[in-house]
Swiss-Prot record:
Reaction equation(s) it catalyzes: S-adenosyl-L-homocysteine + H2O = L-homocysteine + adenosine
Known EC number: 3.13.2.1
Gene Ontology cellular component list: cytosol
Keywords, ordered alphabetically: Cytoplasm, Hydrolase, NAD, One-carbon metabolism
CDD domains in the record: SAHH
Classification via NCBIfam families: ahcY (TIGR00936), PRK05476.2-3 (NF004005)
Protein name stated in the entry: Adenosylhomocysteinase
Requisite cofactors: NAD(+)
Subcellular location: Cytoplasm
Cofactor binding note: Binds 1 NAD(+) per subunit.
């Protein structure tokens, strides 16, 4: 296969010869993704996404390849980039590019490349044509959505690009300035037909809600992250398996007997803490929320502060979606050879920029660095502070991603086929009956048998016999 394949012109991938390997792994993943395969079977004949032009910004993994091919099977035209510079699996990108779908994703790409690729996934047709840009966005972390909003604002007011707050912002702002110098209405045209966005993760949802509250969100949005079958499965059970896989692949460290600090005890933090404890680490948790802190304490975790724990622990994991969770001062206090990593979306959970400014770096292998302080002490930083499970491992298992991506696919169908049911500028979650549908699609694979209510039982507790079974306020 590799002897006859040529890298497509409308793609940017590492090596097209990896396509056959990628295709073999995609076939295996399909057997572990019953939700997506059932959706293909249910909707393929109806083609509900025919006419959809989907700009996708989400980790270009084997599991994402199954999502992309599901969207295409339902009629969509798709262009794709990774939402993280380290998370691409190059064989997955090659396999999708080999089918003719434009893919812009290379593991270890530069930030300059990243923003170039994020621009290129909006180029569906010639300038001025009806299908020039997308009519849907599928986002993870909100960068594709951010690009449209910030670029359109900059068309009218260049001062919004005047004061970047970080190196990544400097590169983003430079990319927007370059695009505007080339085409002064590019962002307005590309965003003109966008019906809505479906957002995968906590960080991106936060951005959407912020824009919605300010009245600046330009299109409809569905918050996929807060579907129960996403947040309580991907965030919890996915991280429970992929965190330690990433740490182990990167360091080969013995986790048993170590002291590990998990910063944050939301769903991601809960899964991370459980995983480390399962390997017999002594796990401590930091929290800002008294409810989450009490949950951690009731599960037997010691609840501490970073200031108290910095010089005592061996492994540190950030899970919060916030900034400056592990500071330069914390890292100065750490033991020699302490391991520091992040499983939240962005690298600013750890003050990596200050490490770059004040310390020497020595690459041990890709995505594993010794950071050397002036006194000679070294810490091991994984994935340069970006997602450790995808930077140093292969991310979540296929089965749990089937839950998340089934939600994404259903959300895309909902927004594209029923836009009148969703107001521009507002953020929605999928209704409970669709959440329950996603769960049903996965029960057979794990050998689960569902008990059915009798008519009398349903009437007694006041729910429909076929669901939904819980009020929207139920926490699971």
């Amino acid at each position: 296969m590799s002897a006859v394949l040529k890298s497509p012109a409308d793609s940017a991938i590492a090596d097209i010869s990896l396509a056959e390997w990628g295709r073999k792994e995609i076939r295996i993943a399909e057997t572990e993704m019953p939700g997506l395969m059932a959706i293909r079977e249910e909707f393929a004949a109806k083609q509900p996404l025919k006419g959809a032009r989907i700009t996708g910004s989400l980790h270009m993994t084997i599991q994402t390849a199954v999502l992309i091919e599901t969207l295409k099977a339902l009629g969509a035209d798709v262009r794709w980039a990774s939402c993280n510079i380290f998370s691409t699996q190059d064989h997955a990108a090659a396999a999708i590019a080999a089918t003719g779908t434009p893919v812009f994703a290379i593991k270890g790409e530069t930030l300059v490349d990243y923003w170039d690729y994020t621009h290129r996934i909006f180029d569906f047709g010639p300038k001025g044509s009806e299908g020039e840009g997308p009519n849907m966005i599928l986002d993870d972390g909100g960068d594709a959505t951010l690009l449209m909003h910030l670029g359109k604002r900059a068309e009218k007011d260049a001062s919004v690009l005047a004061n970047p707050g970080s190196e990544e912002e400097r590169i983003l702002f430079a990319a927007i300035k370059a695009k505007l110098a080339e085409d002064s209405t590019w962002y307005s045209r590309k965003s003109a037909q966008i019906i809505g966005v479906t957002e995968e993760t906590t960080t991106g949802v936060h951005r959407l809600k912020e824009m919605s509250a300010k009245g600046t969100l330009m299109f409809r949005a569905i918050n996929v992250n807060d579907s129960v079958t996403k947040s309580k499965f991907d965030n919890l059970y996915g991280c429970r398996e992929s965190l330690v896989d990433g740490i182990k692949r990167a360091t080969d460290v013995m986790i048993a007997g170590k002291v590990a600090v998990v910063c944050g005890y939301g769903d991601v933090g809960k899964g991370s803490a459980q995983a480390l404890r399962a390997l017999s680490a002594q796990v401590w948790v930091t929290e800002i929320d008294p409810i989450n802190a009490l949950q951690a304490a009731m599960e037997g975790f010691k609840v501490v502060t970073m200031e108290w724990a910095a010089d005592k622990a061996d492994i540190f994991v950030t899970t919060t979606g916030n900034r400056d969770v592990i500071t330069f001062e914390h890292m100065k206090a750490m033991k020699d050879q302490a391991i520091v990593c992040n499983i939240g979306h962005f690298d600013n959970e750890i003050q990596v920029a200050k490490l770059e400014e004040h310390c020497q770096w020595e690459e041990i292998k890709p995505q594993v660095d010794h950071v050397i302080f002036p006194d000679g002490k070294r810490i091991i930083l994984l994935a340069k502070g970006r997602l450790v499970n995808l930077g140093c491992g292969t991310g979540h298992p296929s089965f749990v991603m089937s839950n998340s991506f089934a939600n994404q696919t259903i959300a895309q169908i909902e927004l594209f086929t029923h836009p009148e049911g969703y107001d521009v500028g507002k953020v929605y979650v999928l209704p409970k009956h669709l959440d329950e549908k996603v769960a049903r699609l996965h029960l057979k694979k794990v050998g689960a048998m569902l008990t059915e209510l009798s008519d009398e039982q349903a009437a007694y507790i006041g729910v429909p016999k076929q669901g939904p079974y819980k009020p929207d306020t139920y926490r699971y």
